[in-house]
Amino acid sequence: MSEEKITLYPSNWLYNAGVVGLLKVLEYNKIGFEINEQVIINNSAIKASYEGIFQYHKEVLKENFSIWGKNKRYPNYIQSTQKEFFKNHYVKALQSVEKNGNKKCSWCEGYFIPFNLLEKLERKFSGKDFSGFMEQREKFQGIHFAGLGAAITEVPNSFWNLNFSIPICHLCSYLIIFNHLAFIKTSEGEIFINAPDFKLIWDLNRFAENILTKSKEYEIRKILGSSLLQWAIKRRALLGAWTMMNIEVIVKKKIFDPKTKKTENIIDYFDLPQDITKILLDYEIASLIEEINEEKIFDLILSGKFSELEKANYFVLKAILKLKNKEEISKNDPITKYFTKYKDFNYLKKVSGILPELYLKILEKIGR
């Protein structure tokens, strides 16, 4: 008999980050899953993921993880006295979640623990208020995120229409405790690249992590741009206009408020102009940018300064002529604004053939 499976579809960024965090734990613990536009997991992966999240924190992040009592990430998600009940009974029951037509989830199709199992859970519950415990699993509230309460409750519209009144299901309430694992540390805060496609989300965040191994100081614009470029080169797939428009970076920042003298957590959003996204996701354009392999040229494209590519090529041709005549190229030469390998004759010769083609393809792509 084949094992039952759960299909997870993209939703708001907090939910998507929870799914990606779950996948990181499953991958680390060598538990299989399917990922395309949606994610498919075996029901048994739920219990394995709960055991796995503690292992992941200990072995990968080198820190202890907790969801009970006054922990730093999900304060009072459960009480300390409920720890054994949650692990041995509640998470086990989560493996049997099913769609319930009588209950609503605002984020997914709605996966709830069946009523007959809830009755059994109540008998095992270590406390008096079982209905209160379950109510916490069916409503989006402060236990579901760490240190972001003020940011979300004060400006709910900036949180993709998330608010405290919306109902969520037992599975979504569980997935949220994985969301912090999806965020990547940068010099500008922790980031998560979100999109309406789980494979795209998974790939872009992987590429972002790889990019940051080269330099932790890259700004968010460059991290996103480089991730899109890598995706275009490695996947060679076309994305629809709607998908492109909905690629964004969620940024978690800590800001010191001089008035209250407290450090506050805020949520910010970043995306690239649509033309830039369209350009970077074009395989032929991305390949030419990769072949040039010059950050200064990439920065011009990210900034939308396409006409400067013509200017850059003019200085490349002048530099080639100087090198042919064995003339010295000074550090103040205009070409140094565009290239670091400005003394490499063969490189400049190659680039002189690429830049005009790149410029024309960019103009074609954006319809100029």
Positions of predicted regions on the chain:
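Basic, glycine-/proline-tolerant helical and adjacent loop/strand elements
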Residues: 63-223
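Intrinsically disordered, low-complexity regulatory regions
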Residues: 211-368
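Short, flexible helical or helix-coil boundary motifs
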Residues: 29-30, 53, 57-64, 68, ...
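N-terminal leader/targeting segments
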Residues: 3-4, 195, 262-263
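Generic hydrophobic, helix-prone segments enriched in Leu/Val/Ile
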Residues: 20-25, 176, 249-251, 297
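Conserved small-residue
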Residues: 1-87, 306
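Histidine (H) residue identity feature
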Residues: 9-15, 50, 56-57, 89, ...
